[in-house]
């Protein structure tokens, strides 16, 4: 693909040049080619976007629930019509296999938008009787202008997960995509405008997180920030949001999730789940189950089943329908993952497979890392303690249920957890003791629109998806009505 035209900001229904004068490049990680130069939003651009959003939000909030619902449904239709086009762009920008982006990224994002479009007319208040002459009623009102800050692993899906409930509740959103993968969020802005969204209700500001993101979190005109990213960055976003104007926040942060295989489990099922929990999207999924606990007596058999499945991984041309494994998203991220792999070797973990870059025709110029499985791991190893965010599985053994629950919870993270067992009683007993916000039994990874997702501990605050997320983009106004004569003591 030839280099794209320079990408601008999207403010008030159209493209506009950044006032900062700064740009950055976005790279195709499969081959290292530059996809596009992208303009970076500065402080003045954030001010412009907020002013635009304030104007648009008033128009949007004044529309009826059914009018807003119809517009968002039109956006859903356009997303589905352009699924393949958007998936190709997402593959170029992220490196993910087209077999994945064409069936997951836009599809699941559109599903979430459709879900919230349907919920808009059901967003209602309550009535509370006090006595015969007085009652209270409540209204759920939009917050105003909110900000979404996305991560680089699911660019358009995250933009939809954040914008869908925000817009459904009557807010305007300013979205800052990751500077690593900024392209599809700009396309989403075009689609919203085409669907009839008033100008300013969805503005997109590409830029460097440390600058553009900080300007958004500090801006007094922003009522809420929804952030997806790493724990350290999330803490900065939360601190800036609180210090500036006590903004509400939703944080979807990192994870080091446990996958527990019990001795009664079907090991073929367990191996299939472990593969999806570690190598889907080349391991760049925040909920990945990278700490795989297996009974000591099952370890050898489980390892053989994993090795057999690693042979089924197909890396290569990301547009080949048979490819199911792409490069990492960037060269700096590849180098970071390789440092973790080197650390695992240094600390005594045994490499079962992988452990290096992928080499050969088609791989040398890209950010490729081989699917890697470590075994003979211990809880104190760096690869077991820290989030790697790459195709690296760690296999650990255990002896008892109580032991594995304790060890699974021995982490600062609490995003996800899962178990594989044939015993339904054990499944619920163990899941209820695991300290994680998203849990799976005999499956892994699905996050449907109806399911609230978010983390415990350092893995986040608040939830995305589900009814409660729509409510989190509103504020409740309570009104007391008195029909009798008011009595004053003065």
UniProtKB/Swiss-Prot annotation:
Binding site for K(+) 1: 26-27, 93, 180
Signal peptide: none
Pfam family, one: Aldedh
Residues annotated for NAD(+) binding in this entry: 150-152, 176-179, 230-233, 254, 286, 387
Lineage top rank: taxon: Bacteria
UniProt keywords, alphabetically: Metal-binding, NAD, NADP, Oxidation, Oxidoreductase, Potassium, Stress response
GO molecular function: betaine-aldehyde dehydrogenase (NAD+) activity; identical protein binding; metal ion binding
Record's note on what induces expression: By osmotic stress. Choline is required for full expression. Oxygen and choline exert their control via the transacting DNA-binding proteins ArcA and BetI, respectively.
Activity regulation (record text): Aldehydes with apolar groups are the most effective inhibitors. N-Methylated compounds are also inhibitory, but to a much lesser degree than the aldehydes. The alcohols are more inhibitory than the corresponding acids, and the inhibitory effect increases with the degree of methylation from ethanolamine to choline.
Pathway: Amine and polyamine biosynthesis; betaine biosynthesis via choline pathway; betaine from betaine aldehyde: step 1/1
Keyword Hydrolase assigned: no
pH effect on activity, per entry: Optimum pH is between 7.5 and 9.5.
Active site: 162, 252, 286, 464
Entry keyword Cell wall biogenesis/degradation: no
Chain positions found as Cysteine sulfenic acid (-SOH): 286
GO cellular component: cytosol; protein-containing complex
Binding-site residues for K(+) 2, renumbered to this chain: 246, 457, 460
Protein's recorded name: Betaine aldehyde dehydrogenase
């Amino acid at each position: 693909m030839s280099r794209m035209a320079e990408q601008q900001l999207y403010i008030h229904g159209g493209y506009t040049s950044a006032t900062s004068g700064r740009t950055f490049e976005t790279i195709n990680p499969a081959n290292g080619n530059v996809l596009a130069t992208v303009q970076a939003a500065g402080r003045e651009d954030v001010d412009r976007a907020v002013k635009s959003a304030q104007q648009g939000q008033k128009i949007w909030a004044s529309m009826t629930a059914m009018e807003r619902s119809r517009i968002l449904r039109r956006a859903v239709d356009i997303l589905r019509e352009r699924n393949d086009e958007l998936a190709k762009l997402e593959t170029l920008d992220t490196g993910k296999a087209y077999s994945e982006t064409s069936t997951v990224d836009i599809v699941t994002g559109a599903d979430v938008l459709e879900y919230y479009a349907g919920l808009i007319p059901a967003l209602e208040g309550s009535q509370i009787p006090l006595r015969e002459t007085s009652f209270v009623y409540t209204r759920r009102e939009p917050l105003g202008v909110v900000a979404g800050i996305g991560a680089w692993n699911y660019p358009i899906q995250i933009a939809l997960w954040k914008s869908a409930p925000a817009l459904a509740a009557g807010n305007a959103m300013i979205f800052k995509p990751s500077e690593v993968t900024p392209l599809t969020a700009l396309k989403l802005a075009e689609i919203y405008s085409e669907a009839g969204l008033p100008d300013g209700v969805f503005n997109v500001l590409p830029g460097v997180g440390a600058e553009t993101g900080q300007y958004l979190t500090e801006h007094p005109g922003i009522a809420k920030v929804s952030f997806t990213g790493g724990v350290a960055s999330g803490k900065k976003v939360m601190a800036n949001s609180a210090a500036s104007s006590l903004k509400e926040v939703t944080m979807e942060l990192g994870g080091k999730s446990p996958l527990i295989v019990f001795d009664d489990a079907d090991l073929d099922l367990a191996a299939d789940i472990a593969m999806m929990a570690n190598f889907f999207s080349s391991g760049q999924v925040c909920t990945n189950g990278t700490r795989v606990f297996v009974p000591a007596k099952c370890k050898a058999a489980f390892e053989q089943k994993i090795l057999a499945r690693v042979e089924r991984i197909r890396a290569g041309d990301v547009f080949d329908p048979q490819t199911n494994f792409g490069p990492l998203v960037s060269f700096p991220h590849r180098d970071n993952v390789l440092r973790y792999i080197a650390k695992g070797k240094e600390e005594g973990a045994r490499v079962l497979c992988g452990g290096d870059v992928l080499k050969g025709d088609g791989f040398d110029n890209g950010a490729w890392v081989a699917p890697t499985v470590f075994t003979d791991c211990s809880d104190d190893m760096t690869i077991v303690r820290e989030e790697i965010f790459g195709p690296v599985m760690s296999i650990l053994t255990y002896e008892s249920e109580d032991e594995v629950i304790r060890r699974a919870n021995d982490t600062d993270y609490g995003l996800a957890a899962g178990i594989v067992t044939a015993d339904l009683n054990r499944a619920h007993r163990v899941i209820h003791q695991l300290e994680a916000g998203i849990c799976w039994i005999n499956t892994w990874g699905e996050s449907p629109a109806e399911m609230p997702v978010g983390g415990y501990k350092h893995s986040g605050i608040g939830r995305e998806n589900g009814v409660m997320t729509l409510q989190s983009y509103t504020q409740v106004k309570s009104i007391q009505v008195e029909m009798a004569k008011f009595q004053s003591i003065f």
